[in-house]
């Protein structure tokens, strides 16, 4: 299993991360079996979101006993500080943990910054000061927002769609993250199932030594076959 260091966080994660969106569609016991199989196969990075219904609860159900051996990233789509704290505390409770390794703004239409009127980034800083989160991340599908986050110097990680269908502008996001020592996390490594040649997809990703992939495209019952 190959590992990647996420920029200045110094978090070392396996090249293949576990995107936990699909496990919301299966039972708790089935999810536990898959999650533990992933962990026992060497996967140490699990990415979920408050928006993914019971995905966080299933991670807590399956992995709480090995919490100190894994890295968890989750996300909030909150639009204000009050909802931010509700999401964060719910996520902590769901996953049976007192901290989140990477807490991410979930595909916002803008790049949250201090004094932007939302209170979101200030809430992130307070959560970090309280020890509830370790690092601050942002996920996005918009080139302009992702690049603004990189340029801002406010973020530790960026999660962005990336696969062998990537444009030159997409590749520039990856390169700019490396240049600025930000962790880059690829999502949609098989373009949501559009790419069926997994060997070619892996070969493309192997060109980039700073890119782990959070695979969320798999139907949950197929996940074990691909680990």
List the predicted regions and their residue ranges.
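Short catalytic-loop micro-motif centered on adjacent basic/acidic residues
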Residues: 44-50, 73-74, 134-137, 157-160, ...
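N-terminal binding-site loop/beta-alpha segment at the start of enzyme catalytic domains
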Residues: 1-70
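Catalytic cores of alpha/beta
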Residues: 199-204
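Glycine/proline-rich, positively charged
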Residues: 26-29, 36, 79-185, 190-193
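Hydrophobic packing residues within well-ordered alpha-helices of enzyme cores
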Residues: 59-62, 146-149, 224-227
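A glycine-centered loop/beta-turn motif at secondary-structure junctions
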Residues: 209-210
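Conserved small/polar residues in nucleotide/adenosyl-binding loops
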Residues: 216-223
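Hydrophobic pocket-lining residues within nucleotide cofactor-binding pockets
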Residues: 11, 23, 76, 162, ...
